[in-house]
Amino acid sequence: MTNVTLEVVRREYDRLRPRFPGFCGCDTCQGDVLVYALNRLQPHYVSTRQGEVLTELTLGTDQEKARLDVVLIEGLRKVALAPRCGAKPVTLV
């Protein structure tokens, strides 16, 4: 059983992360951003490869990608303002 949303969120985080060079990005901060996003997105569990492919296609639409990016950017900004790792808080633009 796999939560396809988790895989997609991780991929999108890796794609967006370089756009925010001031963000700490340590394991703790990355985990906090992923958890923030996953708690605001609907999970999509699958048990077959076919289900995974179909769900990836659904989550790959422009509308879903935009929604995911908005949630991830919100998470990046919130975590950057109060990093639990001890890094200096920063405001991301």
Model-assigned labels for residue ranges:
Residues M1-V93:
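Intrinsically disordered, low-complexity, basic-enriched segments
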